[in-house]
From Swiss-Prot:
One of its GO terms (molecular function) is acetyl-CoA carboxylase activity. One of its GO terms (biological process) is malonyl-CoA biosynthetic process. Gene3D superfamilies: 2-enoyl-CoA Hydratase, Chain A, domain 1. It comes from Chlorobium luteolum (strain DSM 273 / BCRC 81028 / 2530). This is Acetyl-coenzyme A carboxylase carboxyl transferase subunit alpha. The lineage of its organism: Bacteria, Pseudomonadati, Chlorobiota, Chlorobiia, Chlorobiales. Acetyl-CoA carboxylase is a heterohexamer composed of biotin carboxyl carrier protein (AccB), biotin carboxylase (AccC) and two subunits each of ACCase subunit alpha (AccA) and ACCase subunit beta (AccD). SUPFAM superfamilies: ClpP/crotonase. GO terms for cellular component: acetyl-CoA carboxylase complex. Its EC number is 2.1.3.15.
Length: 335
């Protein structure tokens, strides 16, 4: 898929592709006028440049820094929760409101059906996730994916509903953090997130957590307790954003690259640390370059995980989940 947004580290590839397109257009427009020898020479030159572009693209995306992965996770054309829901599931019915205060548009959720027609697999699920906007108007409507307390309470209400009807829960995380406004604090932001952690740990149905973009601090963990944690290749998950970390440690946002390295916030880092269970491979260039391929990959992995989790007895499911999170962050001094 063509993209209108170019990140700094992608410019060398974009510039070569522009040159390549010019050469292709030149070949098309002049092939009838030029001698066969000249056309053949131009064709060979194009072929050589195509190989160079492909090699450069692979070199860039196979050697991304942690900060560059943060940039890809924030790409404005990256697929969001509703995109994945509509690409992966059918019969989605959105449910609204926390039954206490309001309906937070930064979190969406509802019942859907996860199907694989080739194998005949069909599983009703409850899917919940953060939702960002694509432009200024929709971002204001979605509060830039930063949930209020009522968003987390809505999410918990839907999880409890799924538990009542014995349906597994899938959460999709993509947030720069929970909304930090005074009004959110007055309505119990910290309590709402803490309550979700407590209740999610005890849910008697399978819970699969997927980090699809940004996973910042309490805003992410409020939907992040599950039996299996999957993470997109170019996403990030951390207690703090690189910019905020930089502003605290160096009193400036100019050290965000160093902060990203220190935080070790990528999928590869977190897999090594035992925080996540699997990495979801992305198309070359990021999920936004081929959203349908990305959704297909994620759908396949979700079906695999659900097939493994659905037969697990309730008590064992809860005990395993609690043990999984209790083991995180344990440090042993062997010296």
């Amino acid at each position: 898929m063509a993209t209108n947004v170019v990140l700094d580290f992608e410019r060398p590839v974009v510039e070569l592709e522009a040159k390549l397109n010019e050469m292709r257009e030149c070949l098309r427009s002049s092939s009838r006028e030029q001698a066969p020898v000249e056309s053949d020479a131009l064709s060979k030159e194009i072929e050589t440049l195509e190989k160079k572009v492909d090699a450069l693209r692979r070199s860039i995306y196979k050697n991304l820094t942690r900060w560059q992965k943060v940039q890809l996770a924030r790409h404005p054309e990256r697929p969001y929760t509703l995109d994945y829901i509509y690409m992966m599931t059918c019969d989605f019915v959105e449910l609204a409101g926390d039954r206490h205060f309001s309906d937070d548009k930064a979190i969406v959720g509802g019942f859907a059906r996860l199907e694989d027609r080739a194998s005949g697999y069909s599983q009703p699920v409850m899917v919940i996730g953060h939702q960002k906007g694509r432009d200024t108007k929709s971002n204001l409507y979605r509060n830039f994916g930063m949930a209020q307390p009522e968003g987390y309470r809505k999410a918990l209400r839907l999880m409890k509903l799924a538990e009542k009807f014995r349906k597994p829960v899938i959460t999709l995380i993509d947030t720069p953090g929970a909304f930090p406004g005074i009004e959110a604090e007055e309505r119990g932001q910290a309590e709402a997130i803490a309550r979700n952690l407590y209740e999610m740990a005890k849910l008697t149905v399978p819970v699969i957590v997927v980090i699809i973009g940004e996973g910042a601090s309490g805003g992410a963990i409020g939907l992040g307790v599950g039996d299996r944690i999957l993470m997109a290749e170019n996403s990030w998950y951390s207690v703090i954003s690189p910019e905020s970390c930089s502003s605290i440690l160096w009193r400036s946002w100019n050290y965000k690259e160093q902060a990203a390295e220190a935080l070790q916030l990528t999928a590869e880092d977190l897999l090594k640390q035992g925080i996540i269970d699997r990495i979801i491979p992305e198309p070359m260039g990021g999920a936004h370059t081929d959203p349908e391929a990305m959704a297909s990959t994620l759908k396949g992995m979700l079906i695999e995980e659900l097939k493994a989790l659905m037969p697990v007895p309730e008590k064992e499911l809860v005990n395993n989940r609690i043990e999984k999170f209790s083991a995180m962050g344990v440090w042993n001094d062997e010296g």
